[in-house]
Amino acid sequence: MQEAALGMIGATVGGGGDGDAAVVAEQNRQMKGEIATHPMYDQLLAAHVACLRVATPIDQLPIIEAQLSHSHHLLRSYASTAVGFSHHDRQELDNFLAQYVMVLCSFKEQLQQHVRVHAVEAVMACREIENNLHSLTGATLGEGSGATMSEDEDDLQMDFSSDNSGVDFSGGHDMTGFGPLLPTESERSLMERVRQELKLELKQGFKSRIEDVREEIMRKRRAGKLPGDTTTVLKNWWQQHCKWPYPTEDDKAKLVEETGLQLKQINNWFINQRKRNWHNNSHSLTSLKSKRKH
């Protein structure tokens, strides 16, 4: 992986010309040595690896890590060929590597977008095929076929058009076999990775909003709670007037003075208190009406 990257960059920067093949090969080795010892080499390698990871199934990522763990041997080999560039050549190499890293970062973003879009489309297409097969035969594809994904996919509720008339998806294979249209284990692993990344992005994107809403709810709860001593005064009045717990305006004015609460807070407390004791209130009203009739 590193050798291929260094070779490609070396050929881009130091290649060309009609000189002898041996001279060109030596120039390429020197260029690789300069790149391997350049301060931006770590950034360059990280950018290459980031692009490679995008389309690499999860079960194959350890292969990349294994290659990176042995990279120091290759670096020592190339570093030994570095002879030192002139100031002008060094500046050109600096500029080239900086631009190349930027290109790789942009390429990684394009790869991510491409993989995500097509992976989701592939999942939905396979789901449609599985449903069609079930409708025709009543059979359900097994887990080993690679057709089923995690049940969490159902939560996405994505709708894609199924109008694919006139398009040949068979790829030269027998459509009745369904095999060529089903993802392999590696493809399923890649799709699962894309799904996890999408869920993480959605969670991160809405995290701040969720926290704001939660804080607003807690603020309103704190604002809605009355001090304990004030509720004691209100409860005492309630107990004394439980048969008809509807304070007059004069009663409310007196409660405002005693508790220090606002009139709106007192009104809300009595409304909520009557709701909490609705059954008892109904019984009291019925008794009161009966007494008035007699």
Swiss-Prot record:
Q: What Pfam families does its record include?
A: Homeobox_KN (PF05920), KNOX1 (PF03790), KNOX2 (PF03791)
Highest taxon of source = Eukaryota
Cross-referenced Gene3D superfamilies:
Homeodomain-like
The ELK domain covers 197-217
Question: What is the stated purpose of this protein?
Answer: Possible developmental regulator.
Question: What family name appears in the similarity comment?
Answer: Belongs to the TALE/KNOX homeobox family.
Q: Which PANTHER family match?
A: HOMEOBOX PROTEIN TRANSCRIPTION FACTORS (PTHR11850)
| Name by which UniProt lists this protein | Homeobox protein HD1
Give the organism the record lists: Brassica napus
Q: Which gene encodes it?
A: HD1
